[in-house]
């Protein structure tokens, strides 16, 4: 259960989603999760770890991208799965500890 969430994704876009409720009273948190995780398992894991009640969970499979390695060699980045956890505006998760 605890190993489903790998790490939080802290980017400019995820910070904007987390700090500014967009007209609605909801907060969005983005996590990198295991490939075999599903929505119900993620909701239960977030509930147990952070003691909050998620309203929704959205899952995105991020595909690998082409990258130039050394000289003329090409490679790919790894694919991963990320989850967007939706919370009520009254609840929050302290990600940066």
Curated annotation (Swiss-Prot):
**Which Pfam families does the record match to this protein?**
Ribosomal_L23
Task: Please name the GO terms of the biological process aspect recorded for this protein, alphabetically.
Answer: translation
| Keywords, ordered alphabetically | Ribonucleoprotein, Ribosomal protein, RNA-binding, rRNA-binding
Which InterPro entries does its entry note?
Nucleotide-bd_a/b_plait_sf, Ribosomal_uL23-like, Ribosomal_uL23/eL15/eS24_sf
TM ranges are none
GO MF terms held by the record = rRNA binding; structural constituent of ribosome
One GO cellular-component annotation of the UniProt record comes to: ribonucleoprotein complex
What is the stated purpose of this protein? One of the early assembly proteins it binds 23S rRNA. One of the proteins that surrounds the polypeptide exit tunnel on the outside of the ribosome. Forms the main docking site for trigger factor binding to the ribosome.
* Assembly behavior: Part of the 50S ribosomal subunit. Contacts protein L29, and trigger factor when it is bound to the ribosome.
Protein name, as recorded: Large ribosomal subunit protein uL23
């Amino acid at each position: 259960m605890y190993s489903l969430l790998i790490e939080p994704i802290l980017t400019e876009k995820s910070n904007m989603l987390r700090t500014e409720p967009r007209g609605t009273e909801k907060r969005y948190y983005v996590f990198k999760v295991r490939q075999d995780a599903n929505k119900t398992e993620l909701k239960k894991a977030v509930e147990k770890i952070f003691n909050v009640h998620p309203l929704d969970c959205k899952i995105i499979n991020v595909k690998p991208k082409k990258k130039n390695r050394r000289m003329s060699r090409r490679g790919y980045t790894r694919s991963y799965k990320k989850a967007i956890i939706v919370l009520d505006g009254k609840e929050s998760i302290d990600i940066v500890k």
